[in-house]
Amino acid sequence: MVSLLAIRREHPGDVAVPVPYVSRLTQKLQPGQTLVIHGTVNNDAKRFEVNLLSGSSEIGSNSQVMLHVSVRFDEGKVVFNSMENGTWGKEERVSNPFKPGQEFDLRIRIHEDKFEISANHKEIHEFKFRLPYSSIEYFVVRGDVKLKGVHWGGRYYTLPFETQFEDGHLASGQRVYVYGTPKGERFNIDFIARNGDILFHFNPRFKEKKVVRNAEIGKAWGAEEREGPFPFKKDIGFDLVFLNEPYSIQIFHDGERMGTFAHRTKNPGEDYIGLRVAGDLELTGLEFSQH
């Protein structure tokens, strides 16, 4: 069994990192990818910032800053800007949704013509490109925060989307991470068998405010399971984790356990061979992990 504390990190590669945090990107960012920063704001925080730069990780007289995000507790604002050849552009401001002493989740998604910025899974701003994103070389976080994890990944997905698990199956102890934003009345995440059976059907339904769990084996649906919370909200992003344990699949939403589904297959360490995602969902990331 894996404890809830072991699940709370929402990404398989998350580790605590020092601040300031400086990363030189080894690959160019691509549209559809998301930069994720999460941690805890210091109790006495005044400001922290995130910068996407080229040429140097430091802001100087000749800097190129494609995106500057300044979270200001002393002003109650989040300020967005860019810098070209050492000169700041025009600021764009929104209210600051973060609080001193609390956990935060800040995400920057790259699109063809803009950055989409979300705070605690809710979009707060779109920043149109002023400089080409393709020249971004550095990703820097500074200021009054403690970082629990920094990573980037994802892509654009067309639904329905289907993929096989690495090594051909989902072994006991492995996890599936699904990142997305609900956009309509329902979506589903299905764990598939080799013969096409749906061994686990995960189906949030907004009109009913229920998460329906079931299995379709031999073209026959079994008994629905509907108990438990409904934590989803339209247009609010989520991180889901599905943990394959010997007797059940444990389900976590944004780090909190939301339910379990007892296996309806004889060999759960071998029988889940793939995943299918469909419905009214903007899928932003999908990952598999041993731990």
Q: Can you describe what each PLM-predicted range is?
A:
Residues M1-S118, K122-D239, L243-F252, E256-H291:
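Peripheral membrane interaction modules
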